[in-house]
């Protein structure tokens, strides 16, 4: 009587991955309840942009979060992983504009309403596409609580926060310098700027001193911006320019009089040491302008053409104007020289256009008072970065924070909740659309045309997704969340903003830990990009190798904060591991007998191999649980891999095969139960990283839980700890490996059995005696005996030395003696090199004096061991000769 479902002969993830995911969802395993008797564990999924398909970075993000959430679910937490997507204001708008352009349409001709209809169509399609990709990866997220940053409930949260900030005096409208994209005609955040190396020029220009026959020479990479110059700055310590400070210069071509100001900002060694100051078109110049009360002259229109009031240059494109200005400077004798200069140019990451720093009227959030408690929270350990080094980046940004420009001149996004009375000019800030002006009662109101920066709504993600500002059970139970998993590239733009938004709106930090991961690079370490054509579609990988293999490769290759390299052979190796687990599980299930198992279920008359594997498995439970707590997910996965592949599959299963095929029913029953227990625990520990294969096998095992996904995480049992059995088995395994190696080197086939004679110290003998029967099966021994002295070994015996014993086998009738001497000579050379290394270390006074006593002693023990091994090898060579 077997009573176990037979598994398919071959591992084929396509046969069960989709089926299992559908079943998980139908059963509601990923939908936690509000249960005050259980602890919650919450992760908010960083919402991917709805601009296209997911890439390997998203796959890594999902795999790490899913590992954490699955482990916590099994550990008895009400584990919520809340998924969603980001509307990605400018990125989506640019993509949809490109789409309608293919139809011969443009945004302005369509009008706001029609264009937004198209964006919503796009949104619907891409949200479903993203969810489909995530489900393929096996994410155990609760899609019943799914959110989108443009949902009605999130829009309500956005408006509430905007009004609250405004009423608290933290939101204001003002003219400040910001990044401007002339193509998209909107302000941009620093996160949307991509810097590219450009071969440009330094134009050296004379600025004449008023009323004198002298000039100051400046150097600029943007000569067209001289139209907005309002000063030239020099360093007050620069002797070359001291006499000019306070004098007026005459701006070439325009004749505008501008002062020479002294400012420490100027680097005396760079360029000419004199800097033209254009406060309206350079962030550094803007600050200099504020310090010296300089006029801000905006010389560009929103589309990058020159404004009216600049003579013949007005109406020209900025680069057309550059050529004309340089030509005129040359003609009028102001151009001194042109030097080649390589510099970084800021471009809009969505449209590729070169951005212009420009003073414009925008809405801003005052950051100083919001940043302070957010800095203190991390310093106090309320939110911890993993790895810790990333808190320095966080502090650096927060301590030097500038006011945040939150308005964007776009159509797709959260419309700014501000209305202007067209009759009296009153500004009305309101959560709901006002019917009349609060000042003059006029109904002639117009809403601000701008939308909010995408990060404004993303900053509210940890609590807006739980229904805030409305009070409800979810918000009370699942907030604050536990862990945020994200890449190091958005610490400033997203993580920091969530921290201060959480403290400001909820009174506490939004998450306890921030797990930072690196980028997924190609095999050569290059960043994956369209231009390099080295991107990898996770769905293609899943189609070829299965989701479990991809997840395993991404997680085992990962350490917090570090980049990883994607290599196909690593995914292939992960698939081979899955295949190994599949075949081993199938073998176990084919041989288990439920009736015999039940009969001997509580019997603990374990063999040495049983005690060893139970002790090792028990240690693994404690180690892996500890690794997960420390966010060492890659280490945890590697440990499970090593145990399952080496100790369970390669050794334990082989060690118990004679029992399984034997006649002793009681021994069988005990072995069956150990096999079942260890396989189940191994699958449970592997489940967070390889959920599909572990679930499929678990269903065939017929475990006590409906699904492995909701099974109880294994616990450490002190009674199973058995160091004696572990030490004994380790010595036996090393000896068997050594015998196998010798036989392989000498080309002795398994069919040719040989006696094995063991010489060992008294303290090790018991271990070998306990496991001597294992040598017959796994070391192809015809018999095993123990020698009182090495002299008892037959002259024609080949030897092998391990840490615990010297093994002799009369193989000379079966081997080539010359080759054996050659092998031992190589072993002798290796041991001599090791002895030399240890002696060198122990003769180093610095090492002996500074290293801990235990480390020095360990080296001495090693040295003695190697010397004994060398002696034994030399004896065998002499005997053979």
Swiss-Prot record:
It is found in: Cytoplasm. A motif ('HIGH' region) lies at residues 48-58. This is Valine--tRNA ligase. HAMAP family: Val_tRNA_synth_type1. Monomer. It catalyses: tRNA(Val) + L-valine + ATP = L-valyl-tRNA(Val) + AMP + diphosphate. It is an enzyme of class 6 (ligase). Its EC number is 6.1.1.9. Pfam families: Anticodon_1 (PF08264), tRNA-synt_1 (PF00133), Val_tRNA-synt_C (PF10458). Its main location: cytoplasm. The lineage of its organism: Bacteria, Bacillati, Bacillota, Clostridia, Eubacteriales.
């Amino acid at each position: 009587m077997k009573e176990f479902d037979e598994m398919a002969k071959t591992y084929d993830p396509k046969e069960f991955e989709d089926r299992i995911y559908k079943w998980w969802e139908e059963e509601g395993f990923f939908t936690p309840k509000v249960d005050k008797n259980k602890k919650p564990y919450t992760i908010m999924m960083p919402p991917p942009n709805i601009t296209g398909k997911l890439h390997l970075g998203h796959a890594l993000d999902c795999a790490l979060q899913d590992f954490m959430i699955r482990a916590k679910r099994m550990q008895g937490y009400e584990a919520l992983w809340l998924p969603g997507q980001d509307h990605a204001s400018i990125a989506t708008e640019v993509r949809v504009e490109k789409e309608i352009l293919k139809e011969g349409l443009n945004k302005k001709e369509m009008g706001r309403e029609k264009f937004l209809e198209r964006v919503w169509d796009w949104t619907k399609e891409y949200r479903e596409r993203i969810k489909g990709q995530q489900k393929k990866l096996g994410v155990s997220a609760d899609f019943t609580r799914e959110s989108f940053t443009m949902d009605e409930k999130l829009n309500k949260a956005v408006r509430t926060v905007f009004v609250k900030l405004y009423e608290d005096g933290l939101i204001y409208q003002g003219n400040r310098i910001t990044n401007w994209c002339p193509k998209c005609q909107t302000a941009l955040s620093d996160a949307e700027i991509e810097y590219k190396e450009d071969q440009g020029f330094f134009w050296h220009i004379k600025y004449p001193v008023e009323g004198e026959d002298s000039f100051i020479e400046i150097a600029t990479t943007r000569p067209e911006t001289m139209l907005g110059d309002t000063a030239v700055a020099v360093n007050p310590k620069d002797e070359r320019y001291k006499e000019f400070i306070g004098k007026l210069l005459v701006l070439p071509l325009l004749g505008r009089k501008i002062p020479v100001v002294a400012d420490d900002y100027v680097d005396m060694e760079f360029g000419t040491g004199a800097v033209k100051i254009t406060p309206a078109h350079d962030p550094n110049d803007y600050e200099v302008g504020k310090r010296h009360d300089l006029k801000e002259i905006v010389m560009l229109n929103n589309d990058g053409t020159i404004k009216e009031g600049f003579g013949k240059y007005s109406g020209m494109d900025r680069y057309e104007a550059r050529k004309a200005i340089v030509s005129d400077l040359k003609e009028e004798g102001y151009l001194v020289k042109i030097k080649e200069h390589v510099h970084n140019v800021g471009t809009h990451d969505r449209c590729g256009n070169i951005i212009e720093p420009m003073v414009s009227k925008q809405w801003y959030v005052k950051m100083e008072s919001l940043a302070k408690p957010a800095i203190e929270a991390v310093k106090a350990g309320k939110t911890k970065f993993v790895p810790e080094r990333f808190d320095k980046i966080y502090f650096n940004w927060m301590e030097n924070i500038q006011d945040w420009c939150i308005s964007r001149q776009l159509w797709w996004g959260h419309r700014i909740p501000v209305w202007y009375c067209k009759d009296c000019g009153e500004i009305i800030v309101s959560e709901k659309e006002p019917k009349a002006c609060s000042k003059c009662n006029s109904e002639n109101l117009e809403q601000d045309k701008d939308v909010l920066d995408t990060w404004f709504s993303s900053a509210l993600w940890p609590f807006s997704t739980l229904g805030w500002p409305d009070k409800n059970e979810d918000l009370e139970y699942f907030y604050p969340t536990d862990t945020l998993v994200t890449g190091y590239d958005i610490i400033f733009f997203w993580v920091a903003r969530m921290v201060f938004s959480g403290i400001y709106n909820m009174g506490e930090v939004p998450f306890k830990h921030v797990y930072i991961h690196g980028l997924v690079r190609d095999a050569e370490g290059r960043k994956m990009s369209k231009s390099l054509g080295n991107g990898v579609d996770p769905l293609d990988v899943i189609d070829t190798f299965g989701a479990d293999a991809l997840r395993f490769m991404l997680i085992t290759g990962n350490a917090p904060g570090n980049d990883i390299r994607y290599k196909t052979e690593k995914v292939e190796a992960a698939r081979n591991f899955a295949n190994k687990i599949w075949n081993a599980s199938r073998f176990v299930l084919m041989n288990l007998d439920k009736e015999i198992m039940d009969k001997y279920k509580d019997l603990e008359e374990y063999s040495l191999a049983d005690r060893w594997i139970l002790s090792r498995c028990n240690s693994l439970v404690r180690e892996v649980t500890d690794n997960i707590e420390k966010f060492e997910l890659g280490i945890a996965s590697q440990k499970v891999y090593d145990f399952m592949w080496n100790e369970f599959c390669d050794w334990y299963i082989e060690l118990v095969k004679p029992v399984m095929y034997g006649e002793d029913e009681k021994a069988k029953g005990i072995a069956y139960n150990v096999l079942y227990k260890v396989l189940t625990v191994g699958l449970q520990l592997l489940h967070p990283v390889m959920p599909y294969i572990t679930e499929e096998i678990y269903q065939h095992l017929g475990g006590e839980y409906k699904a492995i996904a909701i099974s109880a995480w294994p616990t450490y049992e002190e009674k199973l700890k058995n160091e004696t059995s572990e030490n004994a088995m380790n010595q036996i395994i090393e000896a068997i490996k050594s015998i196998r190696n010798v036989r392989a080197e000498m080309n002795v086939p398994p069919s040719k059995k040989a006696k094995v004679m063991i010489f060992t110290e008294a303290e090790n003998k018991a271990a070998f005696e306990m496991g001597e029967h294992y040598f017959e099966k796994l070391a192809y021994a015809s018999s095993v005996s123990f020698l009182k002295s090495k002299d008892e070994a037959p002259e024609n015996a080949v030897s092998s030395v391990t840490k615990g014993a010297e093994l002799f086998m009369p193989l000379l009738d079966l081997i080539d003696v010359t080759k054996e001497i050659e092998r031992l000579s190589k072993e002798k050379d290796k041991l001599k090199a090791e002895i030399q290394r240890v002696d060198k270390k122990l003769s180093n006074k610095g090492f002996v004096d500074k290293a801990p006593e235990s480390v020095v002693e360990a080296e001495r023990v090693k040295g003695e061991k190697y010397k004994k091994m060398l002696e034994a090898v030399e004896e065998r060579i002499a005997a053979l000769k």
